[in-house]
């Protein structure tokens, strides 16, 4: 249930002959430049747009507790100025071509991106690279942007679903970096210094951790040339790309129950379990399970809780996936007097799925939903850029849409049942945001989720 946090601001290096790694099955072309910078492109016929993203394999889980929120703070700060551009210059050049410039931070990576017409591709590559590589951490800018981030935290605190998402992951993962909010805390942001942010930038933002992803009406060789120019002075010979993020998550703490008091008309509930890391091989079986359980209007949770009983307006399930772990969660927002029954029905639905799996008809609908969602989401260059940038950072390879659709179709009911039996019998965490001051004031069915 974690959400990425967008920024609110919308000479030539030594030549190394880098072979183009063309992958005709996926339509993605890939070149590795000196310094370990990876350049991946996808040509989309029939469009006049180009989307450019510089992906950095650094996110909030890479922070020490004393600088919690640094990756997101830095994402904001780098737009303030570079040696050759002021914040106004950056805004005006993008406004002048009708483009979009933005960024977001997640647990494991940060992306700075631009969306422009194809004629403005050279400007977009140069601008995004300038911000990422040469954005300055000036003390005055740090103090100004600190207030912006604190306002963003206040805005998060006023949005029950956003607040709940952060509280749930903390309840599930404890004080592990995956469990900490991407945005940080008031305490960490207020105490963070210019030197800490500058050090984070210099140490973490290196080409070997970066991917330049470009999609649209683009030519791969031209993009490589633009990359050499934009990253000149940073492409050091003999440096290879950083390996993909892997590892095994080890936690000593058990999932917990979190309660945040808010004088609200509704109560917001999230409950769920630790799930699989992205390299464990259960991605699509879990996706099918998620779609069937809480992914749409015909899902079990929606039908049982809203359509049959009218207990909640919004109810859905979701999956968060990280390199070495993940989360499967269910959200519901309801009147306080309905919370106990909502929690009971959710647990009954999940228990039935863990015992009996889902029907063939549910699997067919879930697969159709995944197929349609995947294809429809890739009809613009921004979505394509996101897909190839994430794939390069997370997996180091690229699959075509057709290959992915074939993989989805191959998921069996036995695989879905196995995933359900493994996940839904694990210890649950829960988070509640609403008009309750003490855990003991919560309905017994909610406290029972984590054995309270």
Regions found by a protein language model. Name each.
Residues 2-15, 26, 32, 43, ...:
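Charge-rich, well-structured scaffold segments of protease-associated domains
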Residues 255-256:
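Flexible, small-/acidic-enriched active-site or ligand-binding loops
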Residues 16-18, 39:
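A short, compositionally biased domain-edge/stem linker segment
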């Amino acid at each position: 249930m974690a959400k990425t946090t967008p920024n609110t601001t919308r000479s030539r290096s030594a030549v190394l002959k880098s072979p183009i790694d063309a992958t005709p099955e996926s339509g993605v072309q890939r070149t590795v430049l000196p310094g370990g910078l990876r350049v991946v492109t996808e040509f989309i016929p029939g469009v006049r747009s180009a989307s450019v993203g510089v992906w950095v394999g650094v996110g909030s889980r890479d922070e020490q507790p004393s600088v919690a929120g640094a990756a997101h703070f830095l994402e904001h700060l780098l737009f303030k100025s570079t040696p050759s551009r002021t914040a106004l210059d950056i805004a005006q050049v993008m406004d002048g071509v009708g483009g979009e410039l933005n960024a977001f931070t997640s647990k494991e990576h940060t992306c700075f991106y631009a969306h422009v017409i194809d004629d403005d591709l050279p400007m977009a590559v140069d601008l995004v690279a300038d911000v990422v590589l040469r954005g300055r951490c000036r003390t005055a800018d740090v103090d100004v942007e600190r207030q912006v981030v604190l306002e963003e935290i206040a805005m998060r605190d006023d949005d029950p679903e956003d607040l709940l998402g952060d509280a749930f992951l903390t309840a599930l993962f404890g004080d592990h970096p995956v469990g900490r909010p991407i945005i940080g805390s008031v305490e960490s942001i207020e105490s963070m210094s210019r030197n800490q942010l500058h050090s984070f930038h210099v140490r973490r933002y290196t080409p070997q951790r970066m991917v330049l992803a470009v999609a649209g009406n683009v030519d791969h060789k031209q993009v490589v040339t633009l990359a050499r120019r934009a990253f000149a002075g940073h492409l050091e010979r003999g440096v290879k790309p950083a390996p993909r993020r892997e590892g095994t998550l080890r936690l000593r703490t058990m999932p917990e129950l979190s309660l945040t008091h808010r004088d609200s008309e509704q109560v917001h509930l999230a409950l769920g379990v630790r799930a699989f890391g992205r390299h464990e091989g259960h991605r699509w079986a879990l996706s099918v399970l998620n779609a069937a359980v809480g992914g749409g209007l015909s899902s079990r949770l929606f039908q049982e809780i809203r359509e049959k009983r009218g207990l909640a307006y919004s109810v859905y399930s979701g999956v968060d996936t990280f390199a070495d772990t993940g989360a499967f969660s269910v959200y519901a927002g309801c009147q306080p007097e309905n919370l106990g029954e909502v929690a009971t029905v959710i647990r009954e639905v999940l228990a039935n799925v863990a015992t009996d799996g889902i029907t063939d008809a549910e699997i067919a609908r879930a697969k159709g939903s995944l197929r349609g969602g995947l294809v429809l989401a890739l009809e613009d260059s921004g979505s394509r850029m996101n897909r190839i940038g994430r794939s390069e950072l997370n997996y180091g390879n690229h699959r075509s849409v057709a290959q992915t659709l074939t993989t989805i179709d191959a998921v069996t009911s036995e695989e879905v049942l196995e995933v359900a039996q493994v996940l839904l019998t694990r210890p649950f965490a829960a988070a509640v945001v609403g008009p309750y001051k003490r855990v003991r004031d919560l309905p017994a069915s909610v406290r029972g989720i984590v054995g309270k």
